Amino acid sequence: MANLAKGAIVENLLLAQLREALPQGMCVPSELEALYAWIEANGFYDDVGGRRRGYLYPQDRLRQSWSDDEREGGTDIVFFTDEPKNRDEELRYWFYGEDRELAAEIKQRLCVFAGSGSEGSMCALWLDDAGETKIVHMGSGSGSTMTCVLARSGLDFLRLLAIGYDEICWDEDFSAPPNSEDDDFIVHPNLKFQQWVIETFKTTIPQTALELVTPEHLDDENPSDEFLIWVNRVAE
């Protein structure tokens, strides 16, 4: 985990690498920019192979707190942008599951920026049909299959993360608050992050994710979610 010297000026590499990966016409939501600044100001990142990965909680403390029935840190998510040579391969595998040329429309409208689950699910920025940038979820298929618009604004994405689910890829948890009676594993809230979201954006944290997200899945026969409809079309 990185340590920032007092007064040091450090380039926001996490944000710079995301901007470099954006398709033309896509913008980083201002709230996501603020999040990346908060991550780097707190030193919640590491660097591997020239690529920066950001977190909501210091990973050494999270690992130390992890036991069979509880951990600290709130939602576990990793923010990253893969190196250029791997981006098309990642999307090609997700859409087609085979070595096939990636459709230009996919590259022009989608940019993965986070890993939402340890089983391979991802969050991405997506340009909708009106040219608006939304945050979407791409289920891995081997674990989570949730594929839908996750947040229609950067602020709602931060509010979703602040609720404090273990991982946001598991929509079966979304109908109840974290650490409900049926939960065998306790995830203690990330109070520092929650406080930052509330105070910075003068907002509230929902009780459940269903206040923000209407989950749909890769195998839904008649989807209504605009992102999933698009996925089905471009994956043909």
Where are these regions (language model features)?
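A surface-exposed partner-binding patch
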Residues: A2-D129, Q194, T203-E236
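Generic alpha-helical structural element
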Residues: G7, A21-Q24, G143-M146, L150, ...
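Solvent-exposed, non-transmembrane amphipathic alpha-helical segments
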Residues: R52, T133, F174-P178
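Short, flexible coil/linker segments at or flanking structured domains
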Residues: E98-E101, T145, E181, P189, ...
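Compact, glycine/acidic-enriched structural inserts
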Residues: K134-E172
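An amphipathic alpha-helical core segment
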Residues: A162-A209
